[in-house]
C-alpha cells in the first residue's frame, strides 16, 4: 500500500502513540462539544454537505449500510431519515463519540435501526460482500493508512455497492483561499480551545486538510484500488468534496 504525507499528520506531535491511538483519544476528549462546534464553525453548512453526500445513494436505495468513522452518528441518523434502509451499522474508534451517538439514537427511538460499534476502519469486522453502501464523512483524513481503509471498505461492499466519502478540501480561488486560510489557522483553533479546551485538535484539522490528497488525486487512489464509476463533486467553492466509487 502507498504511504501518503497525510498518514503521518498527528494531533499530538510529542506523543509516542500511533496516529490511530492519538485520533481516538482526541475525539474522546472533544466528543461532548463536537456537534456544537461542527454547527458553530461551519455556520450549519456541514448539515447541507452531509445531505448532499447521502443523496448520492438515492438511486441505489441501499438496504444494509455501514457508516465508517460514524462519530456522533450524524450521518447514520440522516441516512436513515433520507433513505430508510433496513439497517445501518456505524463504527468508530472513539468510545466517547459513540456514547454521544447512542444517546442521540435512543432519544430518536432508532436503536432498532441503527447500531453503533467500536470498530477500526482498517480492519472492519464484517464478512466480504456485506453492505449495499458505505458512507464516511470527515473520516478518511484520520485514517492511519488511507489505502488500507479504502481497501477494507471495498472488501465489505457487495458487488455493485457504492462508497460515498465526504471530506474537507481546499478552495482554488485565491481570494476564497486567503479567507479560508485565515479562518482555519487563526479562528478555528481559538474557537476549539475556547469551547472544547483542545486547541491541538483544531490545529490538527487544518494540517490534515492541507496534506490530504484531494480532488483528482483522491479519485486516482480509488481508481488504483479498482473502484468503478468514480467521480467527485466540489461543494461550497471547494471547501468540501464528495467522492464516490462502486465495487
Residue ranges and their predicted role:
Residues 33-36, 43-63, 78:
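Conserved alpha-helix/loop element of class I SAM-dependent methyltransferases that forms part
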Residues 1-25:
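N-terminal auxiliary segments of SAM/dcSAM-dependent transferases
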